[in-house]
UniProtKB/Swiss-Prot annotation:
The gene is riok-3. Pfam families: RIO1. The keyword Magnesium applies. Residues 100-126, 143-191, 474-510 are annotated as: Disordered. Its cofactor is Mg(2+). Belongs to the protein kinase superfamily. RIO-type Ser/Thr kinase family. Its EC number is 2.7.11.1. It comes from Caenorhabditis elegans. This is Serine/threonine-protein kinase RIO3. Keywords: ATP-binding, Kinase, Magnesium, Metal-binding, Nucleotide-binding, Serine/threonine-protein kinase, Transferase. PANTHER family: SERINE/THREONINE-PROTEIN KINASE RIO1. ATP binds at residues 241-249, 275. One of its GO terms (biological process) is maturation of SSU-rRNA.
């Protein structure tokens, strides 16, 4: 017990022990009854009246000045003083509320308002006056300089400037040119001026230059317009170098309308030609003649993938029959690796670039006989038509041996227009060798009959006869293939792919 009495935490702040008030136990039915509620309200009123009578006895009717407290605090604790003051304030509020109950205006004692409520958020009147005066002076000055009304214009010569002033417009044009990205790089133009004529020309040139740059078909990482080597192609070449297919890629041998040829070396004695097909065939205007209505030629990169694989298959067929052509090595997407035709890293010249004035008639005739043999063997043994044979696609090696290249567009004899393309090849070859002075050349019809073993009339136009022959001798399968060229090309593609595969026990079941 002594410990409990000496414990400061067990005492009240006012020096008295706390006595727990025991609340009376009331049933739930009594709480809901109206009589019980009325009794509680009556008891509260009686207690309030008792407190009011005590206050009246304590203070009486004497008035209290502002310097005096309303109660005698002698012998009272702080809690008793606070309670007495609170009851006094409550009584004053009740009296004021009772007096003003009959009026529509209610008065509340100011002593209950905090000081923050009496302050305002408005700005200082002096600051507002100064700000307004400064604003008026600024507008008055602007009105004097830029007044357009004659009544407001000051006397004497005019000093106002408009946006059409030479100096103002010159500085504005220089600033626009300096900050415009579409025009040429200008460097530091601080303090310079440009007249309207020069500025308009620069802006027009900048717009035309930006439009010209946007006319490129593909982006830089996808397009192969110039060198045919984009990021994907470079990555593929690097992978082949790591695999040991070749050691280095030296440079460009030649460029054409659909591809570019690069030189690759494995050692001092072995070289390869890498043919990279362009992903944009803007220069190959008549490509549709070769691949019209073919489902494989919708996507540009899909086109070049099939185009490279098609040349690989044609070269494989020609090499299988022993025709003079590059030996195919590897193909992937739009990149084809084949043997290099040339000597000591120098590519063999095309017939177009050969200096024929140093050749004799017999040597020229020998070159023609080789070309004629290539055309006949391609038609009869390989069942192919070059479809783009000319002096640009024939190479002459140092030992005067002719090799045929660029057979990506070569087509099978089942193609509906194979004879028409053969006729064009014959015309190109005869025209070229006639121009270089080759003796004893056959006519178009004679060479056509020699290659195809047909009997065309010499006196009539060869192309007309070929078209008529194609119409009259086309079989039912050819008519069906012409109406569905995609199905025909897919069938031939699968047959060639199956024929070029090696011997396998599962070949009959695939």
């Amino acid at each position: 017990m002594a410990n409990c009495e000496n414990n400061p935490w067990k005492k009240n702040a006012w020096g008295k022990n706390e006595e727990t008030a025991e609340e009376p136990i009331v049933s739930f039915a009594d709480v809901l009854s109206e009589e019980f509620i009325e009794d509680l309200s009556v008891q509260e009123k009686l207690e309030e009246e008792r407190y009011m009578k005590q206050l009246d006895q304590m203070f009486g009717d004497t008035s209290v000045s502002d310097d005096q407290l309303p109660i005698n605090t002698e012998g009272m604790t702080d809690e008793e003083v606070a309670l007495a003051l609170q009851r006094h304030f409550d009584r004053e509020a009740d009296v004021a509320r009772a007096v003003g109950s009959s009026s529509s205006v209610h008065f509340t004692p100011d002593r209950y308002h905090p000081k923050t409520m009496q302050e305002t958020d408005s700005e200082n009147e002096d600051d507002d006056a100064l700000r307004q005066a400064a604003t008026d002076m600024l507008y008055a000055k602007l009105d004097e300089e830029n007044a357009t009304n004659s009544r407001l214009r000051p006397e004497g010569p005019s000093t106002s400037r408009t946006k059409h002033d030479t100096g103002v417009s010159g500085r504005r044009n220089a600033d626009k040119t300096f900050n415009d990205r579409n025009t040429l790089p200008t460097g530091d133009m601080v303090g310079d001026k440009l007249n309207n004529k020069v500025f308009n020309k620069l802006m027009a040139f900048g717009k035309s230059e930006s439009k010209r740059q946007m006319r490129n078909k593909d982006k830089e990482e996808k397009a192969t317009m110039d060198t045919s080597v984009d990021s994907d192609t470079r990555l593929l070449l690097l992978k082949w170098i790591n695999q040991g297919v070749f050691d280095s890629v030296d440079g460009i041998i030649a460029t054409g309308k659909e591809s570019a040829v690069l030189h690759a070396a494995q050692d001092s004695a072995t070289s390869y030609a890498i043919k990279v097909y362009k992903t944009t065939l803007s220069e190959f205007k008549n490509r549709s003649e070769y691949v019209k209505d073919d489902f494989r030629f919708k996507n540009p990169r899909g086109v070049l993938k099939i185009w490279a694989e098609r040349e690989f298959m044609n070269l494989s067929r020609m090499a299988k029959h022993g025709l003079p052509c590059p030996q195919p090595v590897k193909v992937r997407r739009n990149v084809l690796v084949m043997s290099f035709l040339g000597d000591q890293g120098l590519a063999a010249p095309r017939l177009k670039n050969v200096e024929w004035e140093f050749f004799t008639d017999d040597e020229r005739r020998n070159v023609y006989d080789q070309v004629q043999s290539i055309m006949c063997r391609m038609y009869k043994e390989c069942l192919l038509v070059h479809a783009d044979l000319s002096e640009f696609n024939l190479l002459l090696t140092p030992d005067n041996k002719v090799h045929v290249i660029d057979v990506s567009q070569a087509m099978d004899l089942s193609h509906p227009r194979s004879l028409q393309f053969l006729t064009r090849d014959i015309q190109n070859i005869i025209t070229f060798f006639t121009r270089i002075g080759t003796p004893n050349l056959p006519t178009y019809v004679q060479l056509f009959n020699l290659i195809t073993d047909l009997d065309m009339v010499e006196d009539h136009d060869l192309l007309v006869q070929v078209e008529q022959f194609s119409e009259e001798n086309r079989s039912v399968d050819l008519r069906h293939d012409k109406s569905r060229p995609a199905d025909m090309e897919l069938k031939k593609y699968n047959e060639e792919k199956k024929a070029n595969r090696g011997i396998s026990p599962a070949r009959e079941y695939n």
